[in-house]
Amino acid sequence: MEALNLKVHDGTGLLITFCGLDGCGKSTMIEKTAAYLERKGHSLLLTRQPTDFVRRSDIFRTYMDLEDHDNYEYRSLSLLAASDRVQHSCHVILPALREGKTVISDRYFYSCLANLRARGYREDRWIYEIAETIPKPDLAFFLDVPVKTAVARVRSRAAEKDRYIDMALQYELRKEYREICGRSGGILINAEGPWEQTFAAVREKIDELLARRPDMSGQVLALLGELAAGSSVCRESRLSEDLGLDSFGRVSLILALEELLDAEFEESDLDPFQLVTAGDVVRLAQKYAGGAYENTAAV
């Protein structure tokens, strides 16, 4: 099996996804992750795939409620779900990421591939082509539990205690999820134990990601201090230097500048893609800090 070639998104936010069997603990991990990131000041969007548009459709409900699927071509349902994921990704997830939000998704495109392959459609190429339009998660968690554990958890829900579950399919799905995770740069999490243990593993990976996206306030303070003092740092060559920041770093830099300059930036100055060089920092400082940087030569 080849890897899904998902598209690296251009947003300043984070995309975190959770996939796995029904009963693997996705809902609990999403709840705990959201609470953890909210305490850290993240603006969140919680979502799921496929969306209710598909889940409420007649073909989806009929297929899910029947034990006998002989009269249904699963590929048609998968195509419906895939088109829904494209629409949802382009018009819900990407805009949120570009607004700097952290998006947490219950299931993702990986689930579409896993379900298709688990049902025997292993030669279909169309799903790989569609994947190239789907934003790649910053963290893709695959929660792994033994099939019997997952089924027992599902059966413990009052509303689903009598639900028909195709056990053979669940074993195939688990195998596909594990393989997709390994080939797509996902993070396999053992979710068989208590939720506290599972979340500790999830939180560790989140913290590792956040640590790679440092707060820029210290660097901003040092740079502006040198600029205000008329240091040689203000030479044109220095001002032309690329700050070397990714989109998240630029957003952090803007927020730090607003706080440092005690100013509320105009919307046009909040665009992180306009903040590339030290000279761009100077221009903002001159605009919002009055005479403190008036003698600094901007590029």
Residue ranges and their predicted role:
Residues 2-9, 32-34, 148-215:
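NTP-dependent small-molecule kinase module
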Residues 18:
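Hydrophobic anchor at the beta1->P-loop junction of P-loop NTPases
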Residues 21:
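P-loop (Walker A) phosphate-binding loop of NTP-binding proteins
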Residues 26:
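Conserved lysine of the Walker
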Residues 29:
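Hydrophobic positions on the alpha1 helix immediately C-terminal to the Walker A/P-loop
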Residues 42-121, 125-129:
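ATP-dependent small-molecule kinase phosphotransfer cores
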Residues 112-175:
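A glycine- and Lys/Arg-enriched "phosphate-lid" helix/loop adjacent to the NTP-binding pocket
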Residues 211-245, 249, 254, 259-299:
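Phosphopantetheine-dependent thiolation modules in NRPS/PKS and related acyl-activating systems
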